[in-house]
């Protein structure tokens, strides 16, 4: 992020309302993140986050069906997970609602865990590692960044995912260090 020097700050303070409006509109049209920030914080405070959530969810659905490079199905899924997390990070920068972020992550995690458990534990450990990263992020969100009442909503699925990862990918140190379950 660029640091704004004092000279620019002084010039902005001297701009009239019309010039400020032009500047805001130009910035919002050039930068999607700034547009979304304006939407959530100023234009539609009540439904802005939900609208961004629905847009992010539909973007994720498009990413699920896109074809990715990779020698095996596991590597293609690992690339898909990277693309999905990139989209979730864009959402999380603008929307500070951790519950919606957790819902998006759970939506992404349903894809690799909908396959057979034979997909895990192969020589293509990039897939196992990327799935493990997503599960770890979900655990961190639920246990540290959200209110503890939300743990009830996600606990069952997270524990199921942890069980599968420990059974199939326990040979990876990163996954071996995960808790057996969360309470």
Predicted regions and their residues:
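Sequence-level detector for tyrosine residue identity
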Residues: 34-37, 42, 65-68, 115, ...
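Eukaryote-biased recognition of C-terminal alpha-helical segments
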Residues: 127-183
């Amino acid at each position: 992020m660029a640091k704004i020097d004092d000279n620019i700050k002084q010039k902005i303070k001297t701009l009239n309302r019309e010039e400020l409006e032009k500047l805001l509109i130009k910035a919002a049209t050039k930068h999607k993140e700034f547009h979304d920030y304006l939407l959530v914080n100023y234009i539609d405070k009540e439904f802005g986050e939900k609208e961004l959530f629905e847009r992010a969810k539909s973007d994720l659905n498009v990413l699920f069906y896109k074809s990715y490079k990779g020698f095996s199905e596991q590597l293609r899924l690992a690339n898909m997970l990277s693309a999905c997390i990139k989209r979730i990070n864009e959402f999380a920068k603008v929307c500070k609602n951790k519950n919606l972020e957790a819902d998006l992550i759970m939506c992404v995690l349903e894809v690799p865990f909908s396959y057979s458990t034979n997909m895990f534990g192969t020589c293509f450990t990039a897939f196992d590692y990327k799935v493990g990263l997503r599960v770890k992020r979900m655990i961190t969100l639920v246990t540290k960044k959200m209110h503890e009442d939300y743990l009830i909503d996600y606990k069952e699925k997270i524990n199921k995912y942890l069980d599968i990862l420990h059974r199939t990918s326990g040979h990876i140190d990163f996954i071996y260090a995960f808790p057996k379950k969360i309470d």
